[in-house]
C-alpha cells in the first residue's frame, strides 16, 4: 500500500488534515485510528449531557493513569484521552474556548514562531467554525465545526453566577472568544443546532470520508514509523487483535497526530527521542531529540460545591425515572436537558496584578457532581470548576516497553512550584467571595465542598492535594520551537528528520488559557495550508483586549 500522506490519529487535528489534504483530488491519504468508529447511535458520545459516560469505560477512552504524583499525596491520577474517530473531541466537555490572544502572542515571541501570533491564527479559528449566530471579525460562518451560543432562560443559575462575578468587581464579557476574554460570561460549545456533539469526526470526516482518495482504517494501533536513514517513509501498525503487522508507505510525509500522550510514545518507539531511554529498551536510535515526551503540561482544577436552596438545579435529571423522557426529547427533537453540556457560563480572571492576562478559569455547572459522573451530591446543588491556567510545573511521557499496547509512564508533577499553591489558595478564596454575592443569595445554601471549616493555607493545600483533578488538557510533549528541547519547527516538521511532522496539542510550547480543542483544530487548519504549499490566510486586523496594568477588578 502506498499513499502520499499517512496520518496517525483521527483526532481533533488528524481529521482536519485528512479533510483538507484530500480536497486535492490527486492527493492520497491513509488515516489510521487505534479506536473504533464514532457510532452515531451511541448516546454516550452523541448526547451532550452524557459527557461523563465515555470517561467511565474504555471503548472511547484510553483511560491512562499517572505515576504517583509526588505533590498530590502520591495519588495516581486520571488522564483520559479520546479513542475513536474524533479523538478527544469525541469525549471532551464540548467547551469551545480558544485561549487568550496573549497566549499566542507569547508563542510568537520565540524566534522562528513569529507567524503563530494571535492575529495570524485568528483566520484559522474562523475557517474551522460555523457559529449559530453568524460570523463576525472573530467568528466563522461556514466552517466544519458547529459552535452554539448560550441562550437566555436555560437555567437561572447561569446568569446569577455571571452577575455574582460582576458584583465582586470583575468585568462581564459577552464573548469569551471575542474582543475580551477576561471576565465572566456565556460559554460557546461544540454542539450542532440539532443537539448533537460536534466532534471533528462529524464536522470534518463526514464531508471527506466518501472521497476516493481518503482511506480510513479504524482499530489500527500504530507500532512505529518506518525510516530510511533520516527520512520517514511509512508506518507499521497492528489491526484489531492481530499480532501480524501491516505496513504502508508514505510517498511524501508521515503526519503524527496522536495527541500529547501517544505522539511522544510513537516517536520513542520509532527511535526518535532521548538516547538513554531508547537504549534501555534496545530501540535503534534514528535521531536523538531529548525533548520528546518532556515539557508535559495540563490544567488542574477543583470543584467548589454549594447546596441550592431553590429546586432549579439539574439534580432531578440524575434520577433514573426522569431519564427516559430526557432521552426521548433529545433523540426525537434535539432539545431539552440532553441537548446541552451544561457548561453554559464561565469566566477568566487575573488573581493578582502580576499576571498580564487571566490565570484562573471558571466553569459553572448547575449540579454538584464530579466531571466523570461520580460522587453526585444527592440534593439540589451547583458548583464552580476553578483552576490555574499556566502552571510552571512540567512533567513527562516515557515509554515503559516496546509494546504499543502498554501505557507509558506519565508524570505531570502537578503543584511542584510555589506559584501553583498560591494560585489555588487565591482561587478558592476568590471563588468563595464571588459565591457570596447578592446575586446568589436566593440560591446559595451551605458550602458542601471544601466546607467552611477549610480556611487556613494548610487546610486549603490539603484539600487541593486530595481533591484537585485533571481538566483533561495535556499538551507540550513535542514542543514547537528552536531551543535544545524543541521537537518540531514552526511548521510542525520534526527537527533533524525529513518527511515527518507532528500536528496536535503536543506541539504547543506553552499551555493556553482555556480548553484545548479549539486551538488544536486551529493548529490542524494552519499546518494543513503549510503542507499543501498554500499561502497563509491574510492576517486579521481585529482588535483585542490587553489589560496593560489595569486593576484586577473594580473597587466596590
Swiss-Prot record:
GO cellular component: membrane
GO BP terms, alphabetized: glycine betaine biosynthetic process from choline
InterPro entries registered for this protein in UniProt: BetA, FAD/NAD-bd_sf, GMC_OxRdtase, GMC_OxRdtase_N, GMC_OxRtase_C
Substrates-to-products reaction catalysed: choline + A = betaine aldehyde + AH2; betaine aldehyde + NAD(+) + H2O = glycine betaine + NADH + 2 H(+)
Record-annotated active site: 473 (proton acceptor)
Cofactor: FAD
UniProt keyword list: FAD, Flavoprotein, NAD, Oxidoreductase
Record carries keyword ATP-binding: no
Molecular function terms from GO: betaine-aldehyde dehydrogenase (NAD+) activity; choline dehydrogenase activity; flavin adenine dinucleotide binding
Function description: Involved in the biosynthesis of the osmoprotectant glycine betaine. Catalyzes the oxidation of choline to betaine aldehyde and betaine aldehyde to glycine betaine at the same rate.
Protein family membership: Belongs to the GMC oxidoreductase family.
Protein name: Oxygen-dependent choline dehydrogenase
Species assigned in the record: Escherichia coli O127:H6 (strain E2348/69 / EPEC)
Amino acid at each position: 500500500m502506498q499513499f502520499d500522506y499517512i496520518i496517525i490519529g483521527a483526532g481533533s487535528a488528524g481529521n482536519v488534515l485528512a479533510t483538507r489534504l484530500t480536497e486535492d483530488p490527486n492527493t492520497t491519504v491513509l488515516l489510521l485510528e487505534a479506536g473504533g468508529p464514532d457510532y452515531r447511535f451511541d448516546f454516550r458520545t452523541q448526547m451532550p449531557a452524557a459527557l461523563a459516560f465515555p470517561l467511565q469505560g474504555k471503548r472511547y477512552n484510553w483511560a491512562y493513569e499517572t505515576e504517583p504524583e509526588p505533590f498530590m499525596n502520591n495519588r495516581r491520577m486520571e488522564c483520559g484521552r479520546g479513542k475513536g474517530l474524533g479523538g478527544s473531541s469525541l469525549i471532551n466537555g464540548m467547551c469551545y474556548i480558544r485561549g487568550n490572544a496573549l497566549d499566542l502572542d507569547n508563542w510568537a515571541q520565540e524566534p522562528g514562531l513569529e507567524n503563530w501570533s494571535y492575529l495570524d491564527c485568528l483566520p484559522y479559528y474562523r475557517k474551522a467554525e460555523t457559529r449559530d449566530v453568524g460570523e463576525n471579525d472573530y467568528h466563522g460562518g461556514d466552517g466544519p465545526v458547529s459552535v452554539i451560543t448560550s441562550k437566555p432562560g436555560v437555567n437561572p443559575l447561569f446568569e446569577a453566577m455571571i452577575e455574582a462575578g460582576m458584583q465582586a468587581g470583575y468585568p462581564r464579557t459577552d464573548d469569551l472568544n471575542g474582543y475580551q476574554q477576561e471576565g465572566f460570561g456565556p460559554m460557546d460549545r461544540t454542539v450542532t443546532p440539532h443537539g448533537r456533539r460536534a466532534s471533528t469526526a462529524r464536522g470534518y470526516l463526514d464531508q471527506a470520508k466518501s472521497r476516493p482518495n481518503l482511506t480510513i482504517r479504524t482499530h489500527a494501533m500504530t507500532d512505529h514509523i518506518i525510516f530510511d536513514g533520516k527520512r520517514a517513509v511509512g508506518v507499521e501498525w497492528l489491526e484489531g487483535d492481530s499480532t501480524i503487522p501491516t505496513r504502508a508507505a508514505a510517498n511524501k510525509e508521515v503526519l503524527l497526530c496522536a495527541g500529547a500522550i501517544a505522539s511522544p510514545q510513537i516517536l520513542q518507539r520509532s527511535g526518535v527521542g532521548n538516547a538513554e531511554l531508547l537504549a534501555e529498551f534496545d530501540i535503534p536510535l534514528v535521531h536523538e531529540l531529548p525533548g520528546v515526551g518532556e515539557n508535559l503540561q495540563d490544567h488542574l482544577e477543583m470543584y467548589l460545591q454549594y447546596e441550592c436552596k431553590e429546586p432549579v438545579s439539574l439534580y432531578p435529571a440524575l434520577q433514573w425515572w426522569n431519564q427516559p423522557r430526557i432521552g426521548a426529547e433529545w433523540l426525537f427533537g434535539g432539545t431539552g436537558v440532553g441537548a446541552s453540556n451544561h457548561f453554559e457560563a464561565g469566566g477568566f480572571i487575573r488573581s493578582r496584578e502580576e499576571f498580564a492576562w487571566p490565570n484562573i478559569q471558571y466553569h459553572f455547572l448547575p449540579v454538584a457532581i464530579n466531571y466523570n459522573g461520580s460522587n453526585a451530591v444527592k440534593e439540589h446543588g451547583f458548583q464552580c470548576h476553578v483552576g490555574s491556567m499556566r502552571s510552571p510545573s512540567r512533567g513527562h511521557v516515557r515509554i515503559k516497553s516496546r509494546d504499543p499496547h502498554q501505557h507509558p509512564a506519565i508524570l505531570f508533577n502537578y503543584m511542584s512550584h510555589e506559584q501553583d499553591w498560591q494560585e489555588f489558595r487565591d482561587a478558592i478564596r476568590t471563588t468563595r467571595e464571588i459565591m457570596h454575592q447578592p446575586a446568589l443569595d436566593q440560591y446559595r445554601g451551605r458550602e458542601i465542598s471544601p466546607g467552611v471549616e477549610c480556611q487556613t493555607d494548610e487546610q486549603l493545600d490539603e484539600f487541593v492535594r486530595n481533591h484537585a483533578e485533571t481538566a483533561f488538557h495535556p499538551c507540550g510533549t513535542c514542543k514547537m520551537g528552536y531551543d535544545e528541547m524543541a521537537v518540531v519547527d514552526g511548521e510542525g516538521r520534526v527537527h533533524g528528520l525529513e518527511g515527518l511532522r507532528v500536528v496536535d496539542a503536543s506541539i504547543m510550547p506553552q499551555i493556553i488559557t482555556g480548553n484545548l480543542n479549539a486551538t488544536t483544530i486551529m493548529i490542524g487548519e494552519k499546518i494543513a495550508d503549510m503542507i499543501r504549499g498554500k499561502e497563509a490566510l491574510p492576517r486579521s486586523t481585529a482588535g483585542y483586549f490587553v489589560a496593560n496594568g489595569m486593576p484586577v477588578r473594580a473597587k466596590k
